[in-house]
């Protein structure tokens, strides 16, 4: 700790004891705690407490107050815990009898102040800071502190209860790891003292008649097995297995969700399947006796573990598939029914009852569809999942939701009434439908899939969020259809024609969300299918390109931005790509570029301008702008617009455009193998000077938005590395053009001011002179600039001394520093 910090600390703590400060902002206290958590402040020796007796004096003074403020008491507990986190400082505080009074069972927990949740929260946080060494654990066990933590697990304050729960988990893990770094064997049950007390508490709670005690213990075990599932947790499970099994047999309703969470965490690890304690039997029993809603998470955990036994895996899969099987049965006549399952794990009437209830039907189907989405691409489940029947059931759900299916059973009629227009189920089903497009076995039902997708796209009742999901699923199926080896071109053209007809209507929707999602769908399709002849033919024969161009003038900025992106992809498809039917149409190219440049310079909103600069960068990257001379003029023109833009993301996009232009030179092959590399590099420097890019790059170094400055600095560092692969700053400062040095020194001085260099002047350096720019790149310390730009915005004031001064300034004891360091 610095001398100045030591000098100010007594005044800070004297201020905190002033009763007039009871209403001040708690941020002062948080800042002071931050001070003591700085590595330089929290010295792991006696030095901090010995050099600053005001610390122990403050702790003693607070304990001596007849009615201390709860917030000051909470702060005191946390401060004491931070100090006691060092073993040496812990021993000194123990000798002073301060820890017993603060953290012992007969200390603060036995006082009237304990009734305030702020004090209890501070106590738990203080203990959390303290338990970093074995003596602290022994202290808590011997003074009754651990019993206080057990009690706080059921604190009326959820924050306190949660913190106490997490503290117990950390204490158990820490006590075992420092006492026995090597793995336990099943025969070695000699737990350390702290672990013994926590484990006994768990065992006693599991045998308790109190539902809350049982839930807390199960919650504790769940957190333990979530963080550790090999080694000693196996030993812990052996001692708990029978009690867990008896809880399951008793069918305690309150404990069932926690039991499922516990077993789910254990089921993700293969070690428990091989361990003693009948884990497999317990999992099977839970899968059989609980409803699909309750057992679903456990079933998914079992299925995700590739080493789970086959019989348990099949039961788990049956639990997940049962609701989908019931949907197929509800939609079909008995003789037509081709289900997913040969037999059920639990009573089928249970699932039918859940699907017949308005309160449970939607939640069950959403949960089931979510689980299926997570399981579809698990390689070890490929042989178990009936993909075709699964796809059929998903399509059936979507037909139920929009009323396009006439149910063939009373159950189907009930489900149909519940699901009609259920957007939650529609969105979940469309997510799964899109993923199923990647499964080869599902290709046989392509016609049925597009029937339902087109029905959703055409229906005026499809709300915008569902329409977006429909577009996504349609896009996935169209991409897969185009890549299918035996695809029928006539079928593809028919589907594409229907899609573009619907898209024409959606692009004219009065709802901006619909227009926006339609444009995003078009952009995605065009990006991935522009090389396909059927796609280009269907696109160009529709009104979609014209309508898309019209939306560049949409009143909603989000729509204009999406229209820019879509027009960018359409331009590649229509004008730039060599295989385009209208490739080479110079007038159309120039017209499109001019429209986008106008948006970049005149649109009042940032989103469309960002979209334009992203589109231009993509065109340049793909080589669609033309020869190098054209690209140079294009980049220069765009950057002269971008450098004055008020949106920092547009300016950042401009830097990405410059980087792409630089990469053209970096990747450009030499015309002659004997051509010196310096000629190639000089050509790049000259092009950057002609295009006025250096002015933009150096100006960006002083940008008031840090990401822009950092990006410019990285780009200039990369440029210099390309020019001078073995560059050293010392060598560069000994060479160079002496007459130009004053202007370079001025430039470096300006750059050091960073964003404080207002109205970056351009008359001090000739940014269009190649020699001056080469000298600047060789001389300026970009590493230093990069380091400064990498500092956080508060690095100057976020120091122990500054924090202490800020606290004193806040309470009016000094006036020199009134800056809030946060």
Task: State the predicted function of each range.
Residues 1-34, 38-75, 79-121, 129-146, ...:
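Elongated alpha-helical scaffolds that mediate protein-protein interactions in large eukaryotic proteins
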Residues 13, 17, 37, 60, ...:
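Amphipathic alpha-helical repeat scaffolds
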Residues 2, 234, 263-334, 338-383, ...:
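Alpha-solenoid helical-repeat scaffold
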Residues 103-105, 150-155, 244-250, 288-289, ...:
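Eukaryote-specific, cytoplasm-facing alpha-helical/coiled-coil scaffolding segments in long proteins
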Residues 31-34, 75-82, 122-129, 147, ...:
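Residue-level signature of alpha-solenoid helical repeat scaffolds
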Residues 94, 98-101, 108-112, 453-471, ...:
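Eukaryotic alpha-helical scaffold "rod" segments
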């Amino acid at each position: 700790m610095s001398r100045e910090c030591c000098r100010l600390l007594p005044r800070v703590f004297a201020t905190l004891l002033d009763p007039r400060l009871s209403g001040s902002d708690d941020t002062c206290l948080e800042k002071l705690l931050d001070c003591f958590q700085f590595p330089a402040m929290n010295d792991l020796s006696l030095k901090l407490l010995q050099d600053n007796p005001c610390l122990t004096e403050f702790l003693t003074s607070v304990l001596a107050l007849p009615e201390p403020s709860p917030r000051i008491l909470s702060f005191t507990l946390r401060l004491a815990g931070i100090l006691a986190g060092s073993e040496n400082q812990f021993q000194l505080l123990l000798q002073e009898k301060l820890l017993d009074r603060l953290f012992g069972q007969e200390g603060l927990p036995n006082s009237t102040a304990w009734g305030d949740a702020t004090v209890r929260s501070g106590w738990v946080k203080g203990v959390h800071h303290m338990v970093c060494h074995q003596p602290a654990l022994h202290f808590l066990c011997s003074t009754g502190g651990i019993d206080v933590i057990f009690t706080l697990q059921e604190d009326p304050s959820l924050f306190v209860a949660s913190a106490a729960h997490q503290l117990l988990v950390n204490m158990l893990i820490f006590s075992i790891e420092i006492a026995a770094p090597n793995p336990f064997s099943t025969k070695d049950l000699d737990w350390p003292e702290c672990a013994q007390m926590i484990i006994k508490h768990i065992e006693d709670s599991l045998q308790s008649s109190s539902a809350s005690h049982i839930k807390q213990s199960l919650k504790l075990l769940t957190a333990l097995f979530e963080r550790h599932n090999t080694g000693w947790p196996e030993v812990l499970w052996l001692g708990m297995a029978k009690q867990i099994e008896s809880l399951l047999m008793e069918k305690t309703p309150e404990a069932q969700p926690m039991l499922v969470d516990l077993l789910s965490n254990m089921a993700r690890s293969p070690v428990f399947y091989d361990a003693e304690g009948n884990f497999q039997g317990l999992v099977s029993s839970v899968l059989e006796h609980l409803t699909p809603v309750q057992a679903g998470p456990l079933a998914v955990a079992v299925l995700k573990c590739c080493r789970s036994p086959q019989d348990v895996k099949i039961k788990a899969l049956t639990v997940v598939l049962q609701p989908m099987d019931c949907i197929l049965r509800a939609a079909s006549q008995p003789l037509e029914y081709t289900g997913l399952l040969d037999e059920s794990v639990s009573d089928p009437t249970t699932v039918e009852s859940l699907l017949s209830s308005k309160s449970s039907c939607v939640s069950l189907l959403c949960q089931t569809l979510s689980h299926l989405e997570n399981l579809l691409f698990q390689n070890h489940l490929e042989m178990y999942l009936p993909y075709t029947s699964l796809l059929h059931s998903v399509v059936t759900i979507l037909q139920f939701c929009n009323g396009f299916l006439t149910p063939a059973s009373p159950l189907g009629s009930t489900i149909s009434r519940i699901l009609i227009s259920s957007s939650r189920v529609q969105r979940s089903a469309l997510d799964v439908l899109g993923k199923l497009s990647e499964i080869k076995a599902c290709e046989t039902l392509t016609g049925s899939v597009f029937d339902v997708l087109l029905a959703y796209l055409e229906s005026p009742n499809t709300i915008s969020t569902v329409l977006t999901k429909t577009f996504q699923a349609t896009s996935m199926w169209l991409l897969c259809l185009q890549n299918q080896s035996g695809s029928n071109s006539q079928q593809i053209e028919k589907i594409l024609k229907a899609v573009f007809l619907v898209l024409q209507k959606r692009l004219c929707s009065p709802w901006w969300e619909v227009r926006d999602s339609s444009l995003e769908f078009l952009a995605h399709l065009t990006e991935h299918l522009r090389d396909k002849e059927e796609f280009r033919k269907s696109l160009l024969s529709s009104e979609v390109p014209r309508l898309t161009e019209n939306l560049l003038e949409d009143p909603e900025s989000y729509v204009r931005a999406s229209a820019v992106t879509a027009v960018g992809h359409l331009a590649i498809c229509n004008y730039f790509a060599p295989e385009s039917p209208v490739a080479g149409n110079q007038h159309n190219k120039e017209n499109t570029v001019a429209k986008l440049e106008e948006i970049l310079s005149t649109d009042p909103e940032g989103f469309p301008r960002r979209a334009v600069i992203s589109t231009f960068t993509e065109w340049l990257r793909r080589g669609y702008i033309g020869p190098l001379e054209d690209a140079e003029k294009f980049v220069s023109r765009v950057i002269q617009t971008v450098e004055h833009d008020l949106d920092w993301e547009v300016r950042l996009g401009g830097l990405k455009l410059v980087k792409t232009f630089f990469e053209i030179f970096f990747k450009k092959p030499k015309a002659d193998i004997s051509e010196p590399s310096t000629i190639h590099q000089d050509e790049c420097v000259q092009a950057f000077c002609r295009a006025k890019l250096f002015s933009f790059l150096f100006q960006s170094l002083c940008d008031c938005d840090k990401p822009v400055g950092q990006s410019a600095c990285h780009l200039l560092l990369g440029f210099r590395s390309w020019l001078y692969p073995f560059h050293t700053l010392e060598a560069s400062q000994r060479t160079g053009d002496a007459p130009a040095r004053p202007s370079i020194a001025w430039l470096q001085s300006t750059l050091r001011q960073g964003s404080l260099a207002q109205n970056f002047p351009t008359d001090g350096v000739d940014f269009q002179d190649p020699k001056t720019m080469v000298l600047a790149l060789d001389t300026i310390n970009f590493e230093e600039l990069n380091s400064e730009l990498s500092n956080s915005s508060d690095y100057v004031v976020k120091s122990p001394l500054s924090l202490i001064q800020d606290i004193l300034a806040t309470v009016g004891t000094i006036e020199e520093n009134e800056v809030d360091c946060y």
